[in-house]
Swiss-Prot record:
Source organism: Rana temporaria
Keyword Membrane: no
Tissue expression remark: Expressed by the skin glands.
Protein's UniProt name: Brevinin-1T
Family of this protein: Belongs to the frog skin active peptide (FSAP) family. Brevinin subfamily.
Gene Ontology cellular component list: extracellular region
Pfam families named in the record: Antimicrobial_1 (PF08018)
The organism's place on the tree of life at top rank: Eukaryota
Length: 20
């Protein structure tokens, strides 16, 4: 798995779910 994806995906989840 691309480590960049692992770094960016949580940020999108945070923004979408508003749970940071």
């Amino acid at each position: 798995v691309n480590p960049i994806i692992l770094g960016v995906l949580p940020k999108f989840v945070c923004l979408i779910t508003k749970k940071c």
